[in-house]
Amino acid sequence: MLLDTIAAISTPRGEGGISIVRMSGQDSLNILEKIFKPKNKKVSELKNYSINYGHIIDNEHIVDEVLVSIMKAPNTYTREDIIEINCHGGYLVTEKVLEVVLKNGARIAEIGEFTKRAFLNGRIDLTQAEAVIDVIHGKTEKSLSLSLNQLRGDLRDKIATIKKSILDLAAHINVVLDYPEEGIDDPVPENLVENLKKASAEIKDLVSSYDKGKIIKDGIKTAIIGKPNVGKSSILNSLLREDRAIVTHIPGTTRDIIEEVININGIPLLLVDTAGIRNTDDIVENIGVEKSKELINSADLILYVIDTSREIDEEDFRIYDIINTDKVIGILNKIDIKKEINLSKFPKIEKWIEISALSKLGIDNLENEIYKYIMNENIEDSSQKLVITNVRHKSALEKTNEALLNIIETIDMGLPMDLMAVDIKDALDSLSEVTGEISSEDLLDHIFSNFCVGK
């Protein structure tokens, strides 16, 4: 247990029904006794896991009418004594309650320190700590489900199973090398080899799940591009089901990048409506055009829009020539008044979708095509199986598997057992990096810096 007691506001700042001021640490109950006056009881008489009505007091003056939750160690979020003060949700009154708590012995918590204490005190491992922030930031049902699986400890348990296979091998080797008089045969037992091969296959599956998992968690950046007034903003509004971007018949209305997130079948899609790309003397519009060109190179998917009510011209081809990826879907907009267009002039685009953004005709087909394009493999059940979404986990697991394959090769070649020692250590260390059993202070600081102060 860490020695000092920390406190912070755990709810968003601003006005609301309630705010929560949270304390964690060995002095939490002592501090509460100084500042809380429960109705008809003493603080020392309050039961564990109870909610208690009363007032926060500062120098005999009432600060606020509150409900106080008491949770005593070790069965708490941090494995320390935790007090949560539910006060009125005004900005000033919440600050006053926190001020009283700090004045009586607590210190302000660092970013993510409550969850960091849960990790340091052994209640959760590092994968579960990372899952906490993923749950908070979850954008869709699928991403939330993956995060909850990890928070539950699914990845931790899988790592433990893989680690046991390696430790069983290490134990066998130690007996053979340290006690030759026992007469144990040198060859590694077949069941240990099979367990190693199974562990390697499981790691390979986890690593290969990363690309899909990252899409489910973070979504993909999708740029809507085309010349001015082809209907890019109307397409954005149609996909959003609301009027987010200004739509006029005047070319150049969208002068800056507009970003919005939509949910397509459980996949978050960061839609970016770009400024129409054209030659212009307008300084502000020109900045937007340059941003659009940069975005084309960084986008995961491009929606290239053509206005079918007009003839194709040099501007259409100039924008098409900027596209340097095959990750593109062509959109033929305004099909209700379309002209005949020779699509063979756009060989980089294999798939075209006909729509009318104004009347919403074809928008459902566009959404389905975007989803099919992203999910070119069936991952409908990804939320029901173990999927990794963190590049740190992927990198460490790749190192683990490299060491495992070296071990298996050493066994298959019949080489001396002591040659496996380095690879066994590397495999175990890499797995421990995933769970946080081996971690640097810089890594922990980086991970917990993504949290809010009260978490």
Curated annotation (Swiss-Prot):
Keywords: Cytoplasm, GTP-binding, Hydrolase, Magnesium, Metal-binding, Nucleotide-binding, Potassium, tRNA processing. SUPFAM superfamilies: P-loop containing nucleoside triphosphate hydrolases (SSF52540), TrmE connector domain (SSF116878). The keyword Zinc does not apply. It is an enzyme of class 3 (hydrolase). It is found in: Cytoplasm. NCBIfam families: mnmE_trmE_thdF (TIGR00450), PRK05291.1-3 (NF003661), small_GTP (TIGR00231). This is tRNA modification GTPase MnmE. It comes from Fusobacterium nucleatum subsp. nucleatum (strain ATCC 25586 / DSM 15643 / BCRC 10681 / CIP 101130 / JCM 8532 / KCTC 2640 / LMG 13131 / VPI 4355).
